[in-house]
């Protein structure tokens, strides 16, 4: 919903997203910021409800694209930089692979001789499943 964006412009954005197939994206609703060129030169002429509708459409499409991308990683092995404990389960750790995708995996696997990992460690993981935002992994 940038100033002056038409429905055709918005559809073009969705079309580019489909064509490129981004793994992930940072998506925000436009809001005027004092002192910027846009605030000085362009009237904020897109209604808030329309900005929200367009953003929700972009987010829904990106969630589909991210899930497709993450599904292609199932079965692959990655070296992951551990960031710390998972927010959902303290027995799990989370970190990012070299492709910047978030991975969640057991912090320790005693039966495999894999000790507890901590932030800053590198661990090898294999992707078992995924969501649109996360690769669910096992330590290898």
Q: Model regions: which residues?
A:
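Terminal RNA-binding accessory module
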Residues: 38-140
């Amino acid at each position: 919903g940038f100033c002056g964006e038409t429905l055709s412009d918005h559809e073009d954005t969705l079309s580019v997203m489909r064509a490129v197939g981004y793994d992930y994206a940072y998506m925000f609703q436009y809001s005027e910021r004092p002192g910027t060129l846009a605030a000085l030169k362009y009237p904020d002429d897109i209604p808030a409800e329309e900005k929200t509708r367009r953003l929700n459409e972009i987010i829904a499409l990106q969630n589909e694209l991210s899930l497709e991308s993450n599904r292609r990683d199932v079965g692959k092995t990655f070296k992951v930089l551990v960031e710390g404990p998972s927010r959902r389960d303290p027995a799990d750790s989370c970190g990012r692979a070299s492709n910047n995708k978030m991975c969640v995996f057991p912090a320790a696997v005693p039966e495999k001789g894999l000790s507890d990992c901590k932030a800053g460690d590198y661990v090898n993981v294999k992707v078992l499943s995924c969501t649109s935002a996360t690769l669910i992994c096992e330590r290898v």
